[in-house]
Design a protein with these regions (language model features):
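Catalytic toxin/effector domains delivered as secreted proteins or via bacterial secretion systems
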Residues: 1-150
């Protein structure tokens, strides 16, 4: 992922065009878990292909409206984007990833931890992550409205 450039996997066969899919940013913030303030700052590799004006046919909401409420936007696969922990730890670097990609490569993407070693088994860390997700998508929407990360 490093540079955020993509010119092989998933590109048109024979294409020499480099498409910038990800932009690395540093998210800074805190959340409360059981009344305790926790630092949730981390690097996030943001997708550059989110359609903020996409309208969900079931709810009539745009991706931007979803994000302002703390929900993930829909990706090109028609499913909400997911935040993948690249090092499989909370707090750690993350990437905005399509749900279908996350599922297809689940064994590879989650191979750093053994069975039962997920941070999700820790109720406080799981709660922290869920709070982070909502805060992150709200923040991401605000960045878009300010003209940043478009």
């Amino acid at each position: 992922m490093g540079t955020g450039f993509h010119g092989g996997f998933g590109s048109t066969k024979g294409s020499r065009i480099k498409i910038r899919i990800f932009t690395p940013i540093y998210f800074e913030g805190t959340v409360k878990v059981n009344g305790i303030v926790r630092d949730i700052s981390r690097r996030v590799y943001q997708r550059n292909d989110i359609n903020f004006h996409y309208i969900d046919k079931d709810t009539g909401q745009t991706n931007l409206q979803r994000m302002l409420k703390g929900n993930a936007p829909y990706g090109r696969d028609g499913k909400p984007l997911e935040l993948h922990h690249t090092l499989q730890k909370e707090v750690g670097p993350m990437v905005e990833i399509h749900e279908t990609t996350h599922q297809e490569y689940k064994r590879i993407l989650h191979g750093l931890r053994g069975s039962g070693e997920s941070f999700r088994n820790d109720k406080e860390l799981d709660s922290q992550y869920r709070n982070f997700k909502r805060a992150y998508w709200k923040w991401r929407a605000q960045q878009y409205l300010k003209g940043e990360n478009k």
